[in-house]
Amino acid sequence: MARKGPKRHLKRLAAPSSWYIERKAYKWAVRPRPGPHNMRTSIPLLYIVRDYLGYAKTAREARKILNEGKFLVDGKVRKDYKFPVGIMDVVSIPETGEHYRVLPNRIGKLVLHPISEEEANIKPLRIRNKRMVKGAKVQLNFHDGTNHLIPLTEKDNYFTSYTVLMKVPEREIMEVLPFEKGAYVFVTQGKNVARKGRIVEIKKFPMGWPDVVTIEDEEGELFDTLKEYAFVVGKDKPKISLP
């Protein structure tokens, strides 16, 4: 008999390696709902409340806190304990004045990086692609599954791999960061995950091979990574704080 619908369960041993959870303490893990991020690059909101920040001891306590609307993601109240919170998302707790940005660390684990209240209103969004829509508009599609409409006359200001600094929750574009030589990038995946620096060279390959970028870190060391792993976060220097 065929399976009906998506999977609803997840064993802890099979959970993504990017999650900071105990693997052998319990059998089951919370499976994130389909949403803005895929399972590998996000973590359920319940684990942020309970395991990361320690505001609850049990899943029941964590769900109660979320149902009271005490946690915001990108400036919006989120009550679904399975909501996937991913890279560059901002988690805010108004009652305590805490703000965090979700970023990977050097071993590929998703961590909460403390940020200021002012920075909590800024979210970098990497452009995955763009498409024409009705009404002489162009739709920008971002890495977190969201999109934004711009006038057709502005389409040449936005290209794939560019980063848009978005004001949240208003969803207003504040600045566009081109993917070019000299741009400051943060590596989100691969063996050089969480390293940062300036782009020295962009190597393009034919026949469908992925493009590679050479980056110079703050110590002057050069390293290569795939273009899709390099997330532009500034021009001469980063526009957001990084670990």
Swiss-Prot record:
For whether the record's keyword set contains Glycosyltransferase, the answer is: no
Ribonucleoprotein: present as a keyword of the record? yes
Q: Name one GO biological process term.
A: translation
Instruction: Give the S4 RNA-binding domain ranges.
Output: 43-105
Keywords assigned by UniProt, alphabetized: Ribonucleoprotein, Ribosomal protein, RNA-binding, rRNA-binding
GO CC annotations? Answer: cytosolic small ribosomal subunit
List, alphabetically, the SMART domains matched: KOW, S4
Residue intervals passing through the bilayer: none
> What family is reported?
Belongs to the eukaryotic ribosomal protein eS4 family.
Q: What is this protein called?
A: Small ribosomal subunit protein eS4
Organism lineage reads as: Archaea, Methanobacteriati, Methanobacteriota, Thermococci, Thermococcales
